[in-house]
Design a protein with these regions (language model features):
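Acidic/aromatic-lined carbohydrate-recognition and catalytic surfaces
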Residues: 2-182, 186, 190
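A glycine-centered loop/beta-turn motif at secondary-structure junctions
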Residues: 191-195
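Conserved small/polar residues in nucleotide/adenosyl-binding loops
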Residues: 196-204
Length: 204
């Protein structure tokens, strides 16, 4: 019985920004990755682990995602990504992508809607709480800041972020949010991603 491919192949992690610049702007990009596939194949690489290429304001180097359905402009276009998938297939190199769904960017459309009002349909996509005596709901700290809570004066509540204040935590108790994330995942799988690494999975 043959072992699954992900147990046997050599993986190579690619951080797009610093891997290979194809157009001289000083930023690595998808076309740069494509240009190095022959070399990766020669090395014996059987799968690449691609760090985030999604649209992001880059408050945390791409791990703050503004739009899960778009490619960061600095890295290229969706057509470039589709070409990458095609070229990987020709080289028999599998594609694994970072899945960042513990949180989104605070510029994501869901969070923009969520912070508008307490009765907004997207409010419960994130974790909001009342403060205590004018302070944070509790004493939790984040990985990046002393407090895991940030105040939003629009609705006089605090939102949870286990990373930076630019990365509000998604509420995995919300069924509608989960359904949207699962649908997004399936769309990327349909494009040719074969497997995900779940970033910050232990924080979900």
């Amino acid at each position: 019985m043959n072992s699954p491919w992900w147990k046997e192949r050599v993986f190579y992690q690619i951080y797009p920004r610093s891997f290979q610049d194809s157009n001289g702007d000083g930023i690595g990009d998808i076309q740069g990755i494509i240009s190095r596939l022959d070399y990766l194949k020669w090395l014996g690489i059987g799968a690449i682990w691609l760090c985030p290429v999604y649209d992001s304001p880059n408050a945390d180097m791409g791990y703050d995602i503004r739009n899960y359905e778009s490619i960061m402009a600095e890295f290229g276009t969706m057509e470039d990504f589709e070409q990458l998938v095609e070229e990987l297939h020709k080289q028999d190199i599998k594609l694994v992508m970072d899945l960042v769904v513990n949180h989104s960017s605070d510029e994501h459309a869901w969070f923009i809607e969520s912070r508008k009002s307490k009765d907004n349909p997207y409010r419960d996509y994130y974790i909001w709480r009342d403060g205590k005596d004018g302070k944070e709901p509790n004493n939790w700290s984040s990985f990046f800041t002393p407090s895991a809570w940030s105040y939003d004066k629009t609705t006089d509540q605090w939102y949870l972020h286990l990373f930076s204040e630019k990365q509000p935590d998604l509420n995995w108790e919300n069924e509608n949010m989960r359904a949207e994330v699962y649908a997004m995942i399936n769309r990327w799988l349909d494009k040719g991603c074969l497997l995900y690494t779940s970033d910050a999975a232990d924080e979900l």
